[in-house]
Amino acid sequence: MPGSYFSFATMPATFTLGKLERLKRRKVIDQLFSEGKAFTVFPVRVQYLFSALPDAVPLQAGFTASGRNFKKAVDRNRIKRLMREAYRLQKNPLQEQLLQKQKQLGLFFIYTGRELPDYTLVNEKIAVILKRLTRVVNESSAKNT
């Protein structure tokens, strides 16, 4: 449109999932799976670990779907995209909690179901997971003080 101006600076930066917020380093992922804790809110399993992350962000997350349950890469990619979107829109309370407590948390979401989910199911499950993780952050900070 002529005369209109759009800038990324005007967009809220809180609902982003940038490169630094993604869990990518093999060493950190291996540590997460060897030393971390886990719980399941079917059909999503979450592996998490409070640790010093390599980047200066309070929260890093990774996402995966089983190649055993979903043979087509299109299906696996869709599931990961749905989980990333639900996480991106709901991570803010947990992120602010971690900033207040000055902690860093690594997360890995694993889709364990056998059927292709819809967005509402994934959104509900990610919401439950993030609320539970917020409680875990509060409990861990209460133990340390």
Task: For each feature predicted by the language model, list its residue ranges.
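Positively charged, solvent-exposed patches that mediate nucleic-acid binding
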Residues: 1-145
